[in-house]
Amino acid sequence: MEAAVAAPRPRLLLLVLAAAAAAAAALLPGATALQCFCHLCTKDNFTCVTDGLCFVSVTETTDKVIHNSMCIAEIDLIPRDRPFVCAPSSKTGSVTTTYCCNQDHCNKIELPTTVKSSPGLGPVELAAVIAGPVCFVCISLMLMVYICHNRTVIHHRVPNEEDPSLDRPFISEGTTLKDLIYDMTTSGSGSGLPLLVQRTIARTIVLQESIGKGRFGEVWRGKWRGEEVAVKIFSSREERSWFREAEIYQTVMLRHENILGFIAADNKDNGTWTQLWLVSDYHEHGSLFDYLNRYTVTVEGMIKLALSTASGLAHLHMEIVGTQGKPAIAHRDLKSKNILVKKNGTCCIADLGLAVRHDSATDTIDIAPNHRVGTKRYMAPEVLDDSINMKHFESFKRADIYAMGLVFWEIARRCSIGGIHEDYQLPYYDLVPSDPSVEEMRKVVCEQKLRPNIPNRWQSCEALRVMAKIMRECWYANGAARLTALRIKKTLSQLSQQEGIKM
């Protein structure tokens, strides 16, 4: 009888071990599909499915509490053993509590909050409130004296050397920016590198030298793992400009060989001030304005500069329909200073901070209230006389075409044939002051209907004759009569084939 009872024990032990193994496997993210509570998934009965973890958070500010429940994909669990997304965080004025779990609907819970009503101020607290500002003023004065004494006013934190350990967990050794961009364009969403990768790159860049200043900030040449990059640094006052430009650059399917290659955006806070960074490809020739000031160009060089500019603008203006589509974009500040010259003699369009996107589904334009923006010298007639139709997206594209015609004029003047060329000049240099007002430009362009002078010598060269014809058709007072960027691109492509030019 005892032998009969003892016989099943090994079988029972095996069943227990199997159950334990199954339970352990269930704890690993990605082991099986999880069903999680999702407060935004109204069409799916507030349920989402993931191969990672369920997530719930509560963010507390001084005046409200925000609850968030959703799925976290396994690919976003970085690092895998202690994901950043599952860690609590705190910022000035807010505290976020998070919880990650791996059971079906395990995130359908209410996390405890810590915000409590503050009691009335007692004598000690009242004294602290009064003494606090006084102490702050004293400390500030002492700090100013210290800074003046040492004569060191630091505007940018420039590390002496890179610390590769900072990016090792996320970006493997030997990985280049070209590798990261290629991976992003072939397997990603097409809207830019993941934010964590962008931040990792930005925080391991070594600034080398300041190479220019613009309307919203300063541009530096920097290095990341030996590769040169351009870093546009905005002050904290220009946060909206920084955010807008980063947002436009990360538009799905925007990447193009004739649009400046965006790499990363990051905000760097050292406790005293905040710097807002935009990291992009570095082009040693600088802007087209600088390039034309320094060099003349051949017929081939002129066609390359013009065709690549037209190709970039045509890509901006084009809407790509589909799940990985791209909205049509108008630049609104096209000029030679916002076009960069690449090492191979072609151009890429930069400075998209004033650009607007068109949503064809709703026929709306995301535009700031102030529509008279950009550089006055390059403003189209309809912008100068305030007759532009702000609700019609084609109006903005036509204004870009007018500006590109002026850029082509700048390029063609520097085309040297038989040693003959014109000095570099800005459009309307002989008609308006160096910094013209809107009224001065309106008088010349709209009332007198003047346009930049086209030299007679251009008629003796087929390439310059074609360029002159394109310019005139870009400068029509009636925007609807102007050429499109795609038409200009095709005309210049035919010209390059006739001249035997390989792009």
Curated annotation (Swiss-Prot):
Enzyme class of the recorded protein, top EC level: transferase
Residue(s) carrying Phosphoserine: 165, 187, 189, 191
Keywords, ordered alphabetically: Aortic aneurysm, Apoptosis, ATP-binding, Cell junction, Cell membrane, Craniosynostosis, Differentiation, Disease variant, Disulfide bond, Glycoprotein, Growth regulation, Isopeptide bond, Kinase, Magnesium, Manganese, Membrane, Metal-binding, Nucleotide-binding, Phosphoprotein, Receptor, Serine/threonine-protein kinase, Signal, Tight junction, Transferase, Transmembrane, Transmembrane helix, Ubl conjugation
Numbered residues of crosslink Glycyl lysine isopeptide (Lys-Gly) (interchain with G-Cter in ubiquitin): 268
Keyword Isomerase: no
A cellular component term, taken from the record's GO annotations: cilium
EC number of the protein: 2.7.11.30
Name by which UniProt lists this protein: TGF-beta receptor type-1
Keyword match Transmembrane helix: yes
Effect of residue 267 to H: In a patient with Marfan syndrome
All residue ranges annotated as the GS domain in the record: 175-204
Cysteine-cysteine disulfides: 36-54, 38-41, 48-71, 86-100, 101-106
Gene for this chain: TGFBR1
Glycosylation sites recorded in the entry for this protein: 45
Result after altering residue 191 to A: Loss of threonine phosphorylation, reduced phosphorylation on serine residues and loss of response to TGF-beta
Motif (FKBP1A-binding): 193-194
